[in-house]
Structures are given as C-alpha cells and as structure tokens.
C-alpha cells in the first residue's frame, strides 16, 4: 500500500518532467547572406585583403536586430546558416572582384575593412558603418588611405520580415563592397 501511494505521489512530478522535455519550440529558420548573382565575366584581378573584421555582437548564430540605440535582440528561432563573419569575409572579396572587372586598379599592397556596425530593425532600415583602409607602397614608405563608409538600406515590407531583413543586410554588404572597389580604381 505504501509503495502504491509513493508511486502515485511521484506520478505528477514525472509527468511534469516529461512534458518539459517535449518542448513546443519551433525549429529554427536558417538564413544566408546572399551576394548578388555572379556575372558570367572573366575573373577580375584578385585584391589582397589583409583583414575583414566584423563586430562580435553580430557574429552569433542568432540574427541580431536593434530595438533602441543601445539594445540589441538575438532571435533564437531565426538564425544564420553559417557564421556571419565567415559569410561577410567570403562575400566582400567576391563582390569587390565583380565590381572591379574591366577597370584599371591602383597599385595596392593590401586592403583592410573594419565593420563597426551592421544591424537595424525589422520594420525600418539596416545601418552599416565601416572603415576601409587601402595600403599602398611607394618607393619610400607605406601610405594608408582611410575611408569612412556609412549607409542605410531600407528593409522591404514582407510576410517574412526576417527574410527581408537578411536581404537588406546582404544589400548593405554589397554597398560596402562597391565602396571598397571604388577606392581601388584609378
């Protein structure tokens, strides 16, 4: 009798633990940073990138949005399919090369890109700001040209606001890539 009472007393607790282990959390939706479709043109000259730096606060699996000047939100069910820093570090050189096709380049030793901000709101705009450093070697010294880049990209209205947000982030990275290319041309 005591065993039966004990088992009956534990039954609600066991059922509660079982209910907690079977979560109703939806599967995450994965997004990619999509570069523009490559043109069917011959390869452009390779640009020597020394570094493409991304702020740590956006290099998370979760998609980061900003809801005030000093507050960001990480969404647990809307995530990147790959690390965002890696996606940006892959996309920028490809896009720069596409933008340079057929243009005369300055003599460049190396290029560095330091992204300070890349975020925004789902119903507003994406902001990107970065510093582009183009290093050139002269006969006597290394010259560094530093360019500040800033742009806002509107987030299109869409049923899937995160897909529209990811597209705006992609467009912001493409705009940065265009600015890098513009500063490498004679």
PLM features per residue range, with description:
Residues 1-20:
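Sec-dependent bacterial lipoprotein signal peptides
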Residues 20-81, 186:
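A structural "domain/chain start" motif
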Residues 21-38, 98-142, 153-159:
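Surface-exposed short loop/turn segments
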Residues 68, 77-114:
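Short, solvent-exposed, polar/charged sequence segments at loop or secondary-structure edges
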Residues 69-79, 139-178:
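Short secondary-structure boundary motifs at beta->alpha junctions and helix caps
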Residues 85, 89-93, 170-173, 177, ...:
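Extracytoplasmic/secreted envelope proteins and their assembly/folding machinery
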Residues 101-105, 181-186:
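Surface-exposed helix-capping loop/turn segments at secondary-structure junctions
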